[in-house]
A protein has these predicted regions:
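A structural feature that tracks compact, well-ordered secondary-structure segments
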Residues: 165-167
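Nucleotide/phosphate-binding catalytic cleft detector across ATP-hydrolyzing
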Residues: 1-159, 169-283, 290-317, 322-346
Length: 346
């Protein structure tokens, strides 16, 4: 009937900084910053959402509060996240109520944290018809075009905004998984702190991100310098100062080492035959930070396993969701969180 036609399917990958959405009806994937700007009044009126809200980050007037609804890969402000998601889905995109959702979730979190992703769309004005969950690293593997049903062992490292998710997959399922609390934010904060201590110079988070993206952190010249804008902490005057690549490398050393140690300890816990396959198949890098210049080489050298970065690492998981939604066979990788008495309650 008509209802069948009107229904849509959405694939959601909700990161700490970016929301990635696949819209089946339009066959498009879009990305927005996972941020809301509120007016600091009694009602907390919405001032801006998504990319618009993010553009004010660090420069917003004092009566505007900027909020990131996700923290370390899970939903920390449920109502804000629900509002933001509905707002973005409806924004001029012919939003269909009664749609179906497939959501990528991290593995190494509590059942309550997992269920929150499900609750987000089931208890909303979106009136979801069906909600299925898929583990993000499984979605990543599908997005990478890997044969997860038959592989003897692969490792995926998803470098995100506030977390790095490490997974060992074999024979169609998850063998081991660990969520490390290191991400883009960790690196940027480290850069801000070191620049502050060594130069008495305060730079913003976006400037730190530019430094992180522009310097090859591991190889290449050790004498490159970038001039960046900030505020001199002694005079209080805004100015530009040169920052060296060596300083940036020093700032990123510890968080990177933490990721490497986590990879090594996961490999140590991996069954020998699966580990042997990982040494042959390699480590696959996904997530918005996987594009960090030189990251691939660094991991390869430190861990001793060939590392490969996805072509579009930041949309790898949502591309996987798209494939899962399109394929009857891959749909088996998803699971529903609807309890038996749940349909009756609605």
């Amino acid at each position: 009937g008509f209802c069948q036609m009107a229904r849509n399917v959405y694939g959601l990958d909700l990161g700490s900084y970016d929301i990635k959405v696949y819209d089946k009806k339009k066959d498009t994937i879009w990305k927005e910053k996972n941020v809301i700007a509120f007016k600091d009044n009694r009602d907390r009126d919405i001032f801006a959402v998504g990319d618009d809200a993010f553009s004010m980050y660090g420069k917003a007037p004092s009566n505007i509060e900027i909020t990131f609804p996700m923290k370390e890969g899970v939903i920390s402000r449920f109502n804000d996240m629900q509002f933001l998601l509905q707002n973005l889905l409806k924004r001029g995109r012919q939003f269909s109520r009664g749609s179906e959702y497939v959501i990528a979730v991290p593995t190494d979190v509590t059942e309550v944290e997992k269920k929150a992703f499900f609750d987000l769309v089931i208890h909303s004005t979106a009136k979801a018809k069906e909600v299925n969950i898929v583990e993000r690293s499984i979605a990543d593997a599908v997005g990478l075009n890997l044969d997860i049903q038959n592989t003897k062992g692969i490792m995926i490292a998803n470098f995100g905004g506030e977390t790095t998710e490490l997974s060992v997959l074999a024979g169609g399922g998850m063998v081991l998984n660990r969520l490390v609390k290191v991400g883009g934010h960790t690196f940027d904060q480290g850069i801000i702190n070191l620049v502050k201590h060594s130069h008495d110079f305060l730079i913003g988070r976006q400037t730190a991100e530019v430094l992180r993206r522009n310097f090859n952190v591991f190889t290449g010249d050790s004498d490159s310098i970038l001039s960046v804008a900030g505020r001199d902490l002694i005079t209080g005057v805004p100015m530009r100062k040169p920052v060296s690549i060596m300083l940036i490398r020093a700032a990123m050393k510890d968080p990177l080492l933490e990721c490497v140690k986590a990879i090594q300890s996961l490999l140590d816990r991996t069954p020998p035959e699966v580990r042997k396959a990982i040494y042959e198949n390699g480590i696959f890098l996904t997530g918005g930070l996987a594009n960090m210049p030189g990251l691939e080489i660094y991991i390869e050298q430190m861990v001793g396993i060939k590392s490969r970065t996805a072509l579009e690492p930041d949309t790898c998981a949502v591309n996987g969701l798209k494939r899962i939604i399109m394929s009857k066979d891959l749909r088996k990788l998803t699971f529903s969180m609807i309890e038996d008495n749940y349909r009756w309650m609605r």
